[in-house]
Amino acid sequence: MGFFSSLSSLFGLGKKDVNIVVVGLDNSGKTTILNQLKTPETRSQQIVPTVGHVVTNFSTQNLSFHAFDMAGQMKYRSTWESYFHSSQGVIFVLDSSDRLRMELLKDELMMVMEHKDVVSRGIPIVILANKMDIPGAMTASDITVALGLNLYRSGTWSIHSTCALTGDGLDKAMQQLSAEITKYMESRRT
């Protein structure tokens, strides 16, 4: 098996390693989402708030992800940008039931979407409108309008409704992110 894995890697047929940054305000569900993306036997039983950052590894069909789960508390948000230069993708997680912090959320999301490393390198961004299971949560369409994303034409981004606790919506979002990262990596080779 090791021989075939080595041979696959040599010819570019194996899974590609990619770095992604996972950001969003505190208590949006970033760590819970990453926990859902791991294999069942490697999932944590207890989720605690992230301090600084934690690296989580998981795979999709064609990519091996090294996800930098960044703390969302205000004192840590300034550290997010130092990870963009070495990333091939960004996941921005938001709590779709947190209507009180929509303006703050918009500011932080725009900081990410307009960051020089994200823009100049064309890094794809997947926005996860999490906690859709909570009564009164905003829909992805409502969030798109509330954050002004319907007017945002530059960059590669998409928004997906998710529920971190059940995993609903995560497969589709990760398929989208994987496809966008694959396109991004291919465009960087030419």
UniProtKB/Swiss-Prot annotation:
Biological source species: Caenorhabditis elegans
Cellular component GO terms held in the UniProt record: axoneme; cytoplasm; cytosol; dendrite
Positions that bind GTP: 24-31, 69-73, 130-133
PROSITE patterns reported for this sequence: ARF
UniProt keyword annotations, A-Z: Cytoplasm, GTP-binding, Lipoprotein, Myristate, Nucleotide-binding
Gene3D superfamilies: P-loop containing nucleotide triphosphate hydrolases
Pfam entry (one): Arf
Lipid anchor positions (N-myristoyl glycine): G2
GO BP, one annotated term: cilium assembly
Expressing tissues: Specifically expressed in ciliated cells.
GO molecular-function terms, A-Z: GTP binding; GTPase activity
SMART domains in the cross-refs: ARF, RAB, SAR
SUPFAM superfamilies: P-loop containing nucleoside triphosphate hydrolases
Localization: Cytoplasm
InterPro entries: Arl6, P-loop_NTPase, Small_GTP-bd, Small_GTPase_ARF, Small_GTPase_ARF/SAR
Protein's name in the database: ADP-ribosylation factor-like protein 6
Family: Belongs to the small GTPase superfamily. Arf family.
Domain of life: Eukaryota
